Amino acid sequence: MSNQGKDSFKAYSYFCPCGQLFLTIHVSLTRLPQRQLDKRHVVDEKLNHIAHFSTGNKYYITRSDGGYEQRIQLLCRRCTLECAYALEAAPGYIYVDPTLVNEKPVTVSVSNLKE
């Protein structure tokens, strides 16, 4: 096991069921808050992360309270499964489905992070 210097740190990578890397972030999703509506983990895009997904279509869903929301699909680059979404009304957050992604601890180089 190598030492982690100032140029790298421990992070967590999340993979689509097809095996494609989807998201890398410095904290486990289990430590992040969950959205009450659908139990998705809420990732603030201000956190250091590396996004490995593509943006899909916008669509509307009807909520149980009678309201609606517009979502933006965040898709696996390989199989196009929607592993997460973003909300049009709340930019800056990613809502990740914990039932669709598999976690793997990794070491990340600081130079690869999105600021």
UniProtKB/Swiss-Prot annotation:
One of its GO terms (cellular component) is endoplasmic reticulum. GO terms for biological process: endoplasmic reticulum to Golgi vesicle-mediated transport. PANTHER family: STING ER EXIT PROTEIN, UPF0428 PROTEIN CXORF56. May stimulate membrane curvature formation and subsequent endoplasmic reticulum exit site (ERES) establishment. Belongs to the STEEP1 family. This is ER exit protein. It comes from Schizosaccharomyces pombe (strain 972 / ATCC 24843) (Fission yeast). The gene is new20.
